[in-house]
Regions:
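Hydrophobic alpha-helical membrane-embedded or membrane-associated segments
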Residues: 16-20
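Bacterial N-terminal signal peptides that target proteins for export
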Residues: 2-14
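Primary mode marks residue(s) on the alpha4-beta5-alpha5 output face of response regulator receiver
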Residues: 30-233
Length: 233
């Protein structure tokens, strides 16, 4: 259970902190982390074809083969393959972790993820925006302030019903402690009470992350199989 809890924290897509002020505390802690600063951009980039293949591994082939694929460039994510089924697959980097996570700047982080249409319209813009800010050299405090303001002003949309994603890749490296963790699904909801769905209760298989200031709740459900059909062991 402890391993799952640690891993769940490591893979939460785009979790910031509950209040803006904690960003400054996080920056003060950076000096004690294994990755106190952003590495050279080259360490986060991948071979284009390898990144496309890794992105597709996030979901079963029946979904990912016709999905739009985005890859990371020097200024943000770029469309590498146009899709036919409204899904969007990509490989997130370590800065999608909580902003005070010790591995926030870990250049080894690779999180293959595939969003359905609802998540692509409403959750993906947050990932894109945060990545652009990071690659433009913004500080953690500036990133939090910009994203929080955009959410409050509705420049970044609220979650649509049914917004979710697949994270079923064996190829992922979510953190130094979790590795590829376990195959799982995530569901994005605009501010919900986690316990209303039983998340976090004793014996419940559902994890939840509640970001009050971001007006976002993420539910995480581990599943038994990887995208290639093999069983998680």
């Amino acid at each position: 259970m402890r391993k799952k809890q640690v891993g769940a924290i490591a893979i939460k897509s785009f979790a910031l902190l509950v209040v803006l002020g904690t960003a400054y505390q996080a920056m003060a802690q950076d000096a004690t982390t294994p990755y106190p600063n952003m590495a050279p951009i080259e360490q986060y980039l991948m071979d284009r074809n390898a990144e496309i293949a890794m992105a597709r591994s996030a979901a079963p082939e029946s979904i990912s083969r016709d999905a739009e694929i985005r890859v990371l460039g020097r200024h943000g994510y770029e469309t590498a393959v146009k899709g036919k089924n409204d899904f969007v697959c990509m490989v997130e980097r370590s800065w999608i972790s909580p902003i005070d996570d010790p591995g926030f700047w870990n250049p080894k982080g690779r999180a293959p993820i595939c969003f359905n249409a609802a998540a692509a319209r409403t959750y993906l813009p947050r990932v894109i925006k945060k990545t652009e800010l990071i690659l433009a050299g913004r500080t953690k405090a500036q990133i939090i302030e910009t994203i929080a303001s955009a959410v409050e002003k509705r420049e970044l949309p609220a979650m649509e019903p049914a917004a979710m994603c697949y994270m079923l890749s064996k190829q992922g490296y979510l953190s130094d402690s979790a590795g590829h963790w376990h195959p799982h699904l995530m569901f994005f909801v605009s501010q919900s009470e986690p316990t209303a769905r039983g998340a976090g209760l004793p014996g419940s298989p559902i994890f939840a992350f509640n970001d009050t200031w971001e007006h976002l709740t993420t539910f995480l459900v581990p599943v038994r199989e990887w995208s290639d059909g093999t069983e998680d062991r």
